[in-house]
From Swiss-Prot:
Assigned GO CC terms: cis-Golgi network membrane; cytosol; endoplasmic reticulum; phagophore assembly site; TRAPP complex; TRAPPI protein complex; TRAPPII protein complex; TRAPPIII protein complex
Other remarks on this protein: Present with 2370 molecules/cell in log phase SD medium.
This protein's record includes keyword RNA-binding: no
InterPro entries: Bet3 (IPR016721), NO_sig/Golgi_transp_ligand-bd (IPR024096), TRAPP_component (IPR007194)
Superkingdom of origin organism: Eukaryota
UniProt main location, coarse: Golgi
Record's protein name: Trafficking protein particle complex subunit BET3
Span of the signal peptide: none
Subcellular locations according to the entry: Golgi apparatus, cis-Golgi network; Endoplasmic reticulum; Preautophagosomal structure
Complex and partners: Part of the multisubunit TRAPP (transport protein particle) I complex composed of BET3, BET5, TRS20, TRS23, TRS31 and TRS33. Part of the multisubunit TRAPP (transport protein particle) II complex composed of BET3, BET5, TRS20, TRS23, TRS31, TRS33, TRS65, TRS85, TRS120 and TRS130. Part of the multisubunit TRAPP (transport protein particle) III complex composed of BET3, BET5, TRS20, TRS23, TRS31, TRS33 and TRS85.
GO annotation, biological process: cellular response to nitrogen starvation; cytoplasm to vacuole targeting by the Cvt pathway; endoplasmic reticulum to Golgi vesicle-mediated transport; intra-Golgi vesicle-mediated transport; macroautophagy; retrograde transport, endosome to Golgi
Encoding gene (name): BET3
Protein backbone atom coordinates (compact mmCIF):
# COMPACT_ATOMS: atom_id res chain seq x y z
CA UNK A 1 0.00 0.00 0.00
CA UNK A 2 0.96 3.64 -0.38
CA UNK A 3 1.62 5.43 2.88
CA UNK A 4 -0.03 8.74 3.71
CA UNK A 5 3.38 10.42 3.61
CA UNK A 6 4.10 9.05 0.12
CA UNK A 7 0.64 10.10 -1.03
CA UNK A 8 1.15 13.65 0.28
CA UNK A 9 4.59 13.75 -1.33
CA UNK A 10 3.15 12.74 -4.71
CA UNK A 11 0.40 15.33 -4.39
CA UNK A 12 2.92 18.04 -3.48
CA UNK A 13 5.11 17.05 -6.43
CA UNK A 14 2.17 17.22 -8.82
CA UNK A 15 1.14 20.63 -7.50
CA UNK A 16 4.70 22.00 -7.64
CA UNK A 17 5.20 20.84 -11.23
CA UNK A 18 1.78 22.24 -12.22
CA UNK A 19 2.57 25.64 -10.68
CA UNK A 20 6.18 26.04 -11.76
CA UNK A 21 7.09 23.72 -14.63
CA UNK A 22 4.02 23.47 -16.83
CA UNK A 23 3.25 25.79 -19.71
CA UNK A 24 -0.41 26.64 -19.45
CA UNK A 25 -3.00 27.53 -22.03
CA UNK A 26 -6.36 29.14 -21.52
CA UNK A 27 -8.77 26.55 -20.10
CA UNK A 28 -11.65 27.72 -22.26
CA UNK A 29 -9.51 27.50 -25.41
CA UNK A 30 -8.45 23.96 -24.48
CA UNK A 31 -12.03 22.89 -23.74
CA UNK A 32 -13.53 24.47 -26.85
CA UNK A 33 -10.78 23.10 -29.11
CA UNK A 34 -11.41 19.58 -27.81
CA UNK A 35 -15.15 20.10 -28.27
CA UNK A 36 -14.56 21.14 -31.88
CA UNK A 37 -12.55 17.97 -32.49
CA UNK A 38 -15.34 15.78 -31.08
CA UNK A 39 -18.00 17.67 -33.06
CA UNK A 40 -15.99 17.25 -36.26
CA UNK A 41 -15.52 13.52 -35.61
CA UNK A 42 -19.28 13.15 -35.08
CA UNK A 43 -19.82 14.83 -38.43
CA UNK A 44 -17.08 12.84 -40.21
CA UNK A 45 -18.43 9.52 -38.91
CA UNK A 46 -22.04 10.55 -39.62
CA UNK A 47 -22.96 10.33 -35.94
CA UNK A 48 -21.74 6.73 -35.60
CA UNK A 49 -20.72 7.28 -31.99
CA UNK A 50 -19.00 3.91 -31.61
CA UNK A 51 -16.57 4.94 -34.36
CA UNK A 52 -16.13 8.33 -32.70
CA UNK A 53 -15.35 6.57 -29.39
CA UNK A 54 -12.78 4.35 -31.13
CA UNK A 55 -11.15 7.32 -32.84
CA UNK A 56 -10.93 9.33 -29.61
CA UNK A 57 -9.44 6.28 -27.85
CA UNK A 58 -6.88 5.83 -30.64
CA UNK A 59 -5.94 9.52 -30.52
CA UNK A 60 -5.52 9.27 -26.76
CA UNK A 61 -3.44 6.11 -27.04
CA UNK A 62 -1.00 7.84 -29.39
CA UNK A 63 -0.83 10.87 -27.09
CA UNK A 64 -0.26 8.65 -24.04
CA UNK A 65 2.62 6.80 -25.70
CA UNK A 66 4.43 10.13 -26.05
CA UNK A 67 3.16 11.92 -22.96
CA UNK A 68 4.71 9.35 -20.62
CA UNK A 69 8.19 10.46 -21.71
CA UNK A 70 7.39 14.06 -20.76
CA UNK A 71 5.91 12.91 -17.45
CA UNK A 72 8.93 10.80 -16.53
CA UNK A 73 11.33 13.60 -17.51
CA UNK A 74 9.48 16.10 -15.30
CA UNK A 75 9.06 13.86 -12.26
CA UNK A 76 12.09 11.53 -12.39
CA UNK A 77 9.97 9.00 -10.49
CA UNK A 78 11.24 5.42 -10.24
CA UNK A 79 9.21 2.52 -11.61
CA UNK A 80 6.14 1.78 -9.51
CA UNK A 81 6.32 -1.60 -7.81
CA UNK A 82 2.57 -2.31 -7.95
CA UNK A 83 -0.74 -1.06 -9.32
CA UNK A 84 -1.65 0.64 -6.04
CA UNK A 85 1.42 2.89 -6.30
CA UNK A 86 0.74 3.41 -10.01
CA UNK A 87 -2.81 4.56 -9.27
CA UNK A 88 -1.50 7.10 -6.74
CA UNK A 89 1.03 8.46 -9.24
CA UNK A 90 -1.69 8.71 -11.91
CA UNK A 91 -4.15 10.48 -9.65
CA UNK A 92 -1.89 12.77 -7.65
CA UNK A 93 0.83 13.56 -10.21
CA UNK A 94 -0.14 12.83 -13.81
CA UNK A 95 -3.69 14.18 -13.76
CA UNK A 96 -2.52 17.17 -11.71
CA UNK A 97 0.39 18.00 -14.02
CA UNK A 98 -1.53 17.73 -17.28
CA UNK A 99 -5.15 18.62 -16.39
CA UNK A 100 -4.88 20.26 -12.95
CA UNK A 101 -7.32 17.78 -11.42
CA UNK A 102 -6.91 15.01 -8.84
CA UNK A 103 -9.32 12.10 -9.35
CA UNK A 104 -10.30 9.95 -6.38
CA UNK A 105 -9.12 6.34 -6.42
CA UNK A 106 -11.78 3.83 -5.39
CA UNK A 107 -13.45 0.47 -6.12
CA UNK A 108 -10.34 -1.69 -5.77
CA UNK A 109 -10.82 -5.35 -6.64
CA UNK A 110 -9.90 -7.83 -3.91
CA UNK A 111 -6.68 -8.84 -5.70
CA UNK A 112 -5.71 -5.19 -6.40
CA UNK A 113 -5.69 -5.51 -10.20
CA UNK A 114 -8.64 -3.20 -10.91
CA UNK A 115 -9.54 0.26 -9.65
CA UNK A 116 -11.66 3.27 -10.56
CA UNK A 117 -10.77 6.91 -10.98
CA UNK A 118 -13.64 9.22 -10.04
CA UNK A 119 -13.38 12.61 -11.73
CA UNK A 120 -15.11 15.24 -9.62
CA UNK A 121 -14.36 17.68 -12.39
CA UNK A 122 -13.50 17.07 -16.02
CA UNK A 123 -11.98 20.03 -17.86
CA UNK A 124 -12.80 18.42 -21.21
CA UNK A 125 -16.51 18.49 -20.40
CA UNK A 126 -16.89 22.15 -19.39
CA UNK A 127 -19.53 23.96 -21.49
CA UNK A 128 -20.72 20.62 -22.94
CA UNK A 129 -24.21 19.25 -23.26
CA UNK A 130 -24.59 16.09 -25.30
CA UNK A 131 -27.39 15.86 -27.85
CA UNK A 132 -30.07 13.28 -27.02
CA UNK A 133 -28.93 10.87 -29.75
CA UNK A 134 -25.39 10.84 -28.30
CA UNK A 135 -26.27 10.31 -24.63
CA UNK A 136 -26.46 6.51 -24.83
CA UNK A 137 -23.33 5.72 -26.83
CA UNK A 138 -20.85 8.63 -26.98
CA UNK A 139 -18.08 8.70 -24.40
CA UNK A 140 -17.20 12.34 -24.92
CA UNK A 141 -13.89 12.23 -23.00
CA UNK A 142 -12.80 8.82 -24.30
CA UNK A 143 -9.46 10.34 -25.26
CA UNK A 144 -8.56 10.14 -21.54
CA UNK A 145 -8.95 6.34 -21.57
CA UNK A 146 -6.65 6.13 -24.58
CA UNK A 147 -4.05 8.36 -22.91
CA UNK A 148 -4.08 6.13 -19.83
CA UNK A 149 -3.84 2.93 -21.93
CA UNK A 150 -0.95 4.27 -24.01
CA UNK A 151 1.04 5.67 -21.11
CA UNK A 152 0.58 2.56 -18.95
CA UNK A 153 1.64 0.32 -21.83
CA UNK A 154 4.85 2.33 -22.22
CA UNK A 155 5.74 1.49 -18.60
CA UNK A 156 5.08 -2.22 -19.23
CA UNK A 157 1.52 -2.41 -17.87
CA UNK A 158 -1.01 -3.96 -20.23
CA UNK A 159 -4.30 -2.54 -18.99
CA UNK A 160 -7.87 -2.19 -20.17
CA UNK A 161 -9.20 1.32 -19.56
CA UNK A 162 -12.82 2.32 -20.09
CA UNK A 163 -15.53 4.68 -18.95
CA UNK A 164 -18.12 3.25 -16.57
CA UNK A 165 -20.17 6.41 -16.20
CA UNK A 166 -20.15 10.07 -17.23
CA UNK A 167 -22.05 13.04 -15.85
CA UNK A 168 -22.57 14.21 -19.45
CA UNK A 169 -24.65 11.08 -20.06
CA UNK A 170 -26.84 11.74 -17.04
CA UNK A 171 -24.89 9.56 -14.59
CA UNK A 172 -24.25 10.70 -11.02
CA UNK A 173 -20.45 10.70 -11.45
CA UNK A 174 -17.70 10.35 -14.03
CA UNK A 175 -15.83 7.08 -13.50
CA UNK A 176 -12.94 5.54 -15.42
CA UNK A 177 -12.07 1.89 -14.71
CA UNK A 178 -8.50 0.57 -15.06
CA UNK A 179 -7.84 -3.20 -15.11
CA UNK A 180 -4.35 -4.67 -15.19
CA UNK A 181 -4.19 -7.63 -17.58
CA UNK A 182 -0.50 -8.42 -17.24
CA UNK A 183 2.91 -6.90 -16.72
CA UNK A 184 4.79 -6.80 -20.00
CA UNK A 185 8.39 -7.98 -20.14
CA UNK A 186 11.18 -5.71 -21.30
CA UNK A 187 12.26 -7.28 -24.57
CA UNK A 188 14.95 -6.30 -27.01
CA UNK A 189 13.59 -6.11 -30.58
CA UNK A 190 14.66 -8.93 -32.89
CA UNK A 191 17.95 -8.16 -34.60
CA UNK A 192 19.21 -5.80 -31.90
CA UNK A 193 21.64 -6.61 -29.12
Amino acid sequence: MVSTTQSRSLKAMGEEIWKNKTEKINTELFTLTYGSIVAQLCQDYERDFNKVNDHLYSMGYNIGCRLIEDFLARTALPRCENLVKTSEVLSKCAFKIFLNITPNITNWSHNKDTFSLILDENPLADFVELPMDAMKSLWYSNILCGVLKGSLEMVQLDCDVWFVSDILRGDSQTEIKVKLNRILKDEIPIGED
